[in-house]
């Protein structure tokens, strides 16, 4: 796959599930690294709005072992208020992006046994011809705050940059910026996906993170696999955040007090950089 390549929006507009892993490496002042298995969803949001029955085995805006609720995203809108998709479409319109009229796919963690925490979700916004128009990285912190990073005119395999303005961890300052890279493989991009998010402070690269996985349609078998292997996915995410925070504190990583949240809900990406740099 070349950096300049556009992938069409995934065909077969049904929910998909990805099984893979999350990685996190802190480079300073002492190296700290972990890799954990995970799973995530890839949802065709416009299809689900028009045909909710396309959700299949996914409990859509209702209770279920594996579920998705619109109110967990964006402005917290329920389906009667237009849902999460209405928030995303309003955001794009406000930012002058009017040609993302194709499918919008959301990569996110589901609710598992009713519990949800979504550190970051990715909205892939396509034109009617299937080409990728924008990506929105929707970030949540443990204080119940949310911020969106709009990556304009992205290309798969190309590094994109955005200034960091939102508090996520007390061990990372709100300064510097992020470097994003998105990759897809296979027919229509439905074999695997890989997202890299690296954070640079004033001294250079500090934290290298990402999530990758192989995709397959969400059906009874893949749902059963997810619930059997990861029954405590959400609680595990929250527990790991606090456990690794304790380890960083023990390693004397600098502690930064939480600043006030940004006054603007959206930060737009700066000019993309090319070529992409590999993660360490």
Each model region followed by its residue ranges:
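Mature, function-bearing regions of proteins
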Residues: 1-280
